[in-house]
Amino acid sequence: MDQPWNANIHYDALLDAMVPLGTQCVLDVGCGDGLLAARLARRIPYVTAVDIDAPVLRRAQTRFANAPIRWLHADIMTAELPNAGFDAVVSNAALHHIEDTRTALSRLGGLVTPGGTLAVVTFVTPSLRNGLWHLTSWVACGMANRVKGKWEHSAPIKWPPPQTLHELRSHVRALLPGACIRRLLYGRVLVTWRAPV
C-alpha cells in the first residue's frame, strides 16, 4: 500500500527526526490512526501509543497489528504513565484537542526523562498578528492536497484550536525553559524541548 498523505502525516518524518538515535522508549500522544507510532516502532524498541478515541485506536491496532507497539486507550491527562518515564514524547496534531494547553504541556514535559526530548506539532488559532502566515499556509495546504491526494484520517477534528501562537509561546516559555517554537508550512507549529539533566 502506498504511504497516505495529508498535512498532518507530512510532519511524521519531522517528528521522527526529532527523536534522537539511541532512544529506547517513546510515547506518541494522540496517536490517531497510528502512522507515526508505526514509523517510530521501526527503529525504537518500546513505543507506547495513546489515544482517547477508542474506535480510532482500534483501527490503528488493526492496521499495525504486527508492529511492536503498546496501544493504550486513555486520556493523556489522567493516564497512569510513569513520570519521567519516556526518552521521547511526541505528538502530531493532538495538543489542540486538549482545552487547557498549559496543563497539557506541563503533563507532557513531566513524562520526559532527564535529557529526553519533547516534540509536538500542533495548530494555533488564526490571528491578525499572523494573518499572512495562516493565509499562505492555507493556500499551500490546499495545493498540496490537490497535487498529492489528501488521505482522510479517521480521528475527530477539533477547530478552532484553543490558543493563538502568542498564547502558545507564552505557555511554552513559562513551562518548558529553553524550548524552541517554529512556525511550519501547512499552518502547523513545532515545539521542541530537551528536558534538563
From Swiss-Prot:
Keyword Transferase: yes
Homology family: Belongs to the methyltransferase superfamily.
E.C. designation(s): 2.1.1.-
Pfam families listed in its UniProt record: Methyltransf_11
Protein's name according to its UniProt entry: Uncharacterized methyltransferase Rv0089
Family matches, as InterPro entries: Methyltransf_11, SAM-dependent_MTases_sf
Organism in which the protein naturally occurs: Mycobacterium tuberculosis (strain ATCC 25618 / H37Rv)
One GO MF term: S-adenosylmethionine-dependent methyltransferase activity
Record keyword Cell cycle present: no
Keywords annotated in UniProt: Methyltransferase, Transferase
Top-level class of the enzyme under EC nomenclature: transferase
Listed CDD domains: AdoMet_MTases
Entry's Gene Ontology cellular component terms: peptidoglycan-based cell wall
GO biological process: methylation
